[in-house]
């Protein structure tokens, strides 16, 4: 077999088989059909991290990948707390989880991107680099996140933390790409962000009439888990990869025998990410009501049972961050997170407050988003820290992190926002708004009869609600310090120049929250006759 490929007019055609059909351009993934079930799939992976062999020629034709630092530059102890700027707990909780993602933090602290970045403004990677550097190098303090981090997303009210998380991840991925508009999907899959968070699904359909097999590979950055019938993350993953029978009206139209026939469909993870983002689907898309049930999740998770290739030994991930939502629906509540510092100690990051936490407390939360990293990756970064010079350990006086100068007390949530450090934060213009981004997400999806995120009340045009309680009545009893306050818009609303240009964002839900039974990308088919 020849190990080469041809690039013709935007189409990738592989010369690995005797007969090929023309592939459609601008494909997000490839579909391969075979006439019989082989003993070993020709698309099997040599390693979990790289693309499968038959897709490798595509990756080799692309620009070189950004290299991740081999050694850790991350301080061992926990960093700063984050000031709540008014309904921004969802921003703070998400940022803390990203800040304590070892591969991302080490890359940011190396400053490799900013030294070669050609964007004069609006670069999310540069903005995140400034934030992560400040957060990790200011233990015992409370810092104000840059307004540019949420520009185009935050509208003065609470939003969904997972949506903001993927908004940020997608913006960082776009910042890795060249400046020109037309970039193929394969280039996006070689970015720094895809190296850290990305992997590939393998959707395999076997025709029960001719035994032909169709393999479809689809990239992912996070994994959404249905928890309605699951008591644990492992059960939710088992349901996700459980074979599905296609028959009757749902019969499969086989591209080999060219007829509708019963088939078996199996979804598995073909390549594993360095960092897994597992999203527990707690909110109804229609009503916004929350599934407020306890779903067990382990400190160590073996992903091998859910991979395409078996019998290759355990693939162990360790938990390092948990994003928690406290409340009863997406319309109310409060977000905070737990993170694991490089030293191994867990901390609760609740806006400005940073307190030490036990693993028992971490594992007993009603988690919304779970962050796992491959055990080998975590150990590599931990060993690098232990060999290097560590900052001072977290003392008892730092356990409850509140600002010592101009202390941020929760009974005084109304604070005048200080000016941002100009040498750390870029000024940019806003092109993409949250409304536009959500419109792009929903344009191919059937919309409900009413808007579940509709603002129920109308405020005067000259006021802004600061950190309004999402618990309604319940928050007043348990968190009186988080009740609503008002701040003049003239002192808190970012100017047009302070907003960040994130560009036009592609649909995240159709890609990040992949449904088991649907293909949400255009496909290109390669018909193989053996």
Swiss-Prot record:
The active site is at residues 89, 334. One of its GO terms (cellular component) is cytosol. Residues 382-411, 477-530 are annotated as: Disordered. It holds the Pfam family HABP4_PAI-RBP1. Keywords: Endoplasmic reticulum, Hydrolase, Nucleus, Protease, Thiol protease, Ubl conjugation pathway. Coiled coil: none annotated. This is Ubiquitin carboxyl-terminal hydrolase 17-like protein 17. It comes from Homo sapiens.
